[in-house]
């Protein structure tokens, strides 16, 4: 059985909160990271394993882990949650689509339907947004919108005066077995960026995003809606940065 009290303590909440409060607290409290796939360790999506890793061991995880943990919490709070699989569009030309390897949630709460996602790393939503086309939605200075592109709904974010595509998805729920298959590909395929690269991200209380990644050269980035900085990092610094900037001890990247 899911330990809701332990989860709420992990994200710093002591009462029975609403959807937006849970979502924002989760994003701020639990880092995004791929340290297990990076080290050749497959990712388990069993709820007990998610609780052990993200709640009790105070680790982070990537989209499947993050959003399945959020799903369990929201269901324990009485909300209806459906699973959706998305194709990441960020950094990808339109004629070269990626597989559906990103998990998104559709949540029914407070008499409305919401698009929830705590698992997109440095570009993730801070709070749920109304499900379907619409926006812009401003969240602590970050701006998001959803547009239609054929059968897909596409989440975009504003950067430097332009709308950047993050991911697209067909708004049809999928069974858990599809999520397991997508997760297995993501954490074990030799060409998966989560196997070959490093990404650790966190959102601060002031909505600043901090990321350590080697996807485009090993660097530490700090971003806020007004701009950001990128600082090159030496490999010998990785373990210290993972511990001091993201609260994850005992890892060397």
What do these predicted regions represent?
Residues 1-60, 65, 75-99, 120-253:
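Mixed-charge, low-complexity segments
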Residues 116-118:
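Beta-strand scaffold of nucleotide-dependent catalytic cores
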């Amino acid at each position: 059985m899911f330990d809701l009290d332990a989860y709420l303590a992990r994200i710093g909440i002591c009462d029975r909160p609403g959807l937006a409060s849970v979502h924002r607290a989760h994003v701020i409290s639990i880092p995004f990271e791929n340290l297990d796939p990076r080290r050749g360790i497959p990712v388990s999506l069993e709820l007990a394993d998610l609780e052990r890793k993200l709640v009790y061991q105070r680790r982070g995880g990537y989209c499947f882990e993050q959003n399945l943990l959020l799903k369990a919490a929201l269901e324990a709070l009485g909300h209806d949650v459906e699973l959706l699989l998305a194709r990441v569009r960020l950094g990808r030309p339109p004629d070269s689509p990626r597989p559906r390897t990103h998990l998104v949630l559709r949540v029914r709460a407070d008499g409305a339907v919401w698009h929830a996602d705590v698992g997109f790393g440095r570009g993730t939503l801070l709070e749920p947004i109304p499900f379907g086309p619409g926006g812009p939605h401003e969240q602590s200075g970050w701006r998001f919108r959803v547009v239609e592109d054929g059968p897909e709904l596409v989440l975009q974010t504003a950067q430097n005066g332009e709308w950047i595509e993050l991911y697209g998805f067909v708004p049809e729920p999928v069974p858990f077995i599809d999520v397991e298959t997508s997760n297995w590909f993501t954490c074990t395929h030799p060409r998966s960026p989560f196997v070959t690269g490093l990404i650790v991200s966190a959102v601060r209380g002031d909505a600043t995003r901090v990321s350590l990644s080697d996807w485009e050269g090993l660097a530490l980035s700090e971003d806020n809606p007004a701009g950001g900085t990128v600082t090159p990092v030496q490999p010998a610094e990785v373990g210290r940065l993972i511990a001091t900037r993201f609260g994850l001890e005992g890892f060397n990247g």
